[in-house]
């Protein structure tokens, strides 16, 4: 494919016009291709944007980019263009490539994304794959990309905390469960399963800074919204989440002493330190629910930045 050759020439010295040209060509040629070729082009387009947005920072330019990010955060609309105008001196300290990307932010689906914890990154806007490819794809692929683009407009977590509501988290888990049942042979099936497992885990365990509970025990604190969703799931008999929700509710009603005899957990960690209550309870719950933590993985596949999942090392 001629277009594939053109895509491979895009790198961190390419211009916005080069991307626009390729994207226009893709829109016209994708509908006439076999699905196998369409999927190869989706993959190639993701790699193309990664090369285009790749940065080689020195200490100095990295610090300047960080400072620029904070200036964007301080600005009411969080509009990089306004910061470029108002903080000329700061802008001049950026690397030439940063200056170029920021001046063209919003074009060719280039977006400056706030990732939380004071960190910014460039990304391809998740709507890209929907706009350029979606219309020509089979139903399962179309549905996958549309849902991902919708969910990933904003960040999913920020500073060890969920950035979405418990209700939204539950709704996402139920969506992917249905997707897996509806399209068991989908090209994206493994990523759909990954998303389902990830959301399922967070429903019951939360994140460090948005826990479901600290002690998961009778008469202790629970996040009321999280608990409400788990109670709701315990009644959804058509979902595989009903059983873990019922087990969870039984677990949190069981006195701690009784639980400690019921579950075999080491109270001392491998360094000979006494484990925290939080740690012990998490291990007991993992034993009970048999869920794997999304963090226990060699390569983390990020499903929250684009309309497809991307391996990060």
Where do the PLM segments sit?
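Short solvent-exposed coil/turn linkers within tandem alpha-helical repeat scaffolds
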Residues: 32-36, 55-58, 131-139, 179-191, ...
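Extended amphipathic alpha-helical interaction segments
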Residues: 96-216
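Extended, non-membrane alpha-helical segments enriched in charged/polar residues
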Residues: 24, 31, 47, 198-201, ...
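Hydrophilic extracytoplasmic domains
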Residues: 217-313
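N-terminal Sec/ER secretory leader and immediately downstream segment
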Residues: 1-122
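Extracytoplasmic/secreted envelope proteins and their assembly/folding machinery
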Residues: 4, 23, 173-180, 189, ...
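Extracytoplasmic/periplasmic, Sec-exported soluble proteins
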Residues: 11-14, 18-21, 37, 41, ...
């Amino acid at each position: 494919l001629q277009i594939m050759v053109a895509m491979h020439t895009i790198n961190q010295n390419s211009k916005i016009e080069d991307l626009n040209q390729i994207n226009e060509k893709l829109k016209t040629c994708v509908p006439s291709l076999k699905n196998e070729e369409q999927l190869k082009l989706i993959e190639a387009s993701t790699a193309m944007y990664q090369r285009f947005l790749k940065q080689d920072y020195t200490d100095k330019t990295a610090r300047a980019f960080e400072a620029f990010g904070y200036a964007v955060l301080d600005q009411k609309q969080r509009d990089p263009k306004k910061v470029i105008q108002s903080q000329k001196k700061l802008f001049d300290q950026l690397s030439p490539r940063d200056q170029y990307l920021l001046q063209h932010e919003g074009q060719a689906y280039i977006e400056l994304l706030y990732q939380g914890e004071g960190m910014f990154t460039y990304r391809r806007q998740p709507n890209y794959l929907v706009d350029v490819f979606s219309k020509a794809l089979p139903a399962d692929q179309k549905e996958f990309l549309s849902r991902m683009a919708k969910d990933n407009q904003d960040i999913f977590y920020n500073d060890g905390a969920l950035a979405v509501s418990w209700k939204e988290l539950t709704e996402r888990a139920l969506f992917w469960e249905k997707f897996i049942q509806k399209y068991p042979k989908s090209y994206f099936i493994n990523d759909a399963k990954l998303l389902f497992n990830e959301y399922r885990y967070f429903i019951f365990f939360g994140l460090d800074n948005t826990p479901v509970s600290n002690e998961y025990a009778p008469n202790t604190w629970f996040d009321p919204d999280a608990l409400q969703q788990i109670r709701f799931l315990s009644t959804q008999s058509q979902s595989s989440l009903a059983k873990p929700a019922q087990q969870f509710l039984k677990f949190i009603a069981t006195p701690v002493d009784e639980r400690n005899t019921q579950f075999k957990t080491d109270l001392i960690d491998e360094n000979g330190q006494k484990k925290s209550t939080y740690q012990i309870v998490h291990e007991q719950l993992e034993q009970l629910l048999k869920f794997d933590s999304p963090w226990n993985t060699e390569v983390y596949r990020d499903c929250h930045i684009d309309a497809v999942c991307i391996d990060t090392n």
